[in-house]
Amino acid sequence: MNELKLSKRLQTVAEYIPNGAVMADIGSDHAYLPCYAVLNHKASGAIAGEITDGPFLSAKRQVEKSGLNSHISVRQGDGLEVIKKGEADAITIAGMGGALIAHILEAGKDKLTGKERLILQPNIHAVHIREWLYKERYALIDEVILEEDGKCYEVLVAEAGDRDAAYDGISLSAGMLVGPFLAKEKNAVFLKKWTQELQHTQSIYEQISQAADTEQNKQKLKELADRMELLKEVIDHG
């Protein structure tokens, strides 16, 4: 039954699960990721957490269909409240906005020992996750950016460690926004994403610069100019 196929983004998340780990997948939807990880002997066991009835029942059905009831515990609850402290070696949260993932981590941080590996896949606004990890003194140990079905996704991997190590050679503000590992690698997906973002920011800047000359607009123009400068630096240098 290990023919379960994952999307490219979830496959990337799965690759970072430590071998033999007990994983907790928060917002597990159909529990594809924990089922795949256990079936392929990546994880020794898993917890699949879901808050709403539909996805919770879908996850239960998938675990049963995969014959994994003895290896995967499907639990209903909000965020990290589905796990006990120290119960999981790796925590995966995938397919949500960065602000929501950061909120889930903040709301459930009493469940974290600091020894877990966090594997986080935001659909947008990864900056919120990097800021949370830095605040809570987690070390970012790797990042991936990939494109699937015309959309860009990032995967962030963090563990306890030196929170500043990843940001060596890049300003903290730039690293938080675009990702320190991704900025060093600068692959085609990264350049496409941030070139488009720069063009979008320039377009907004031009629109506001033609609007009324208010203090609010002046402040906004300064923020946009700073952002454009930062993006140009990231795209053109290094």
Swiss-Prot record:
Subcellular location(s) of the protein: Cytoplasm
Keywords assigned: Cytoplasm, Methyltransferase, Phosphoprotein, S-adenosyl-L-methionine, Transferase, tRNA processing
Main EC class the enzyme belongs to: transferase
SUPFAM superfamilies listed in its UniProt record: S-adenosyl-L-methionine-dependent methyltransferases
Phosphoserine: residues bearing it: 70
Domain of life: Bacteria
Enzyme Commission code: 2.1.1.217
Name of the protein this chain belongs to: tRNA (adenine(22)-N(1))-methyltransferase
UniProt gene name: trmK
